[in-house]
Curated annotation (Swiss-Prot):
Principal localisation: membrane
Record's keyword terms, sorted: Hydrolase, Membrane, Protease, Serine protease, Transmembrane, Transmembrane helix
Topology with respect to the bilayer: Multi-pass membrane protein
Annotated organism of origin: Acanthamoeba polyphaga mimivirus
Name this protein carries in UniProt: Putative rhomboid protein L523
Taxonomy of the source species: Viruses, Varidnaviria, Bamfordvirae, Nucleocytoviricota, Megaviricetes
Amino acid sequence: MRYVTYIVLLILVVIFFSPLNFFNTNSEIINYLIRTFYHANLQHLLANSFSFYMLSFLEDVMGHAKFAFCIIFIWILSSMLLLAEHTAFPSRKVYTVGFSGVIFGLIVVYLMSLGKNRGLSIAGLVLSIIPQFFVSGISYEGHICGMIAGFVYVVLFPLPKGSVDNQVAMF
């Protein structure tokens, strides 16, 4: 059972449909952390929820605790990287929301843990970022910060090479 996956999905849905506004705090750091769980509309929530679920096989590979730690690590680091980028370049400060930074981080964890064809897969991930520069409403900064956080996670807490080979998302 993918407990962590279902808990995260439940949190995303509850926050989306909640009448409470968790976003307006007095702390910029808290605001950046909370943005990850907000979604612009139902389509955004469904797209991110589906993408996250497709990566939930990592919970089977890593175990519940390590998968939860991985998500929390990527979430916090990518949020802080985004805050640092917006602090360093205030003109780039935009309202960014959504779980996709964490999703991109998990994709990096998956790709870096592949045995064969890892380089080709990573090149595909990098190429997937390019169209985002030409489409409005997509936070490529959030995706890149998530990718960086995923890379840092793999460097600090590597999965055995090939541990995710032949793994597929199961419904």
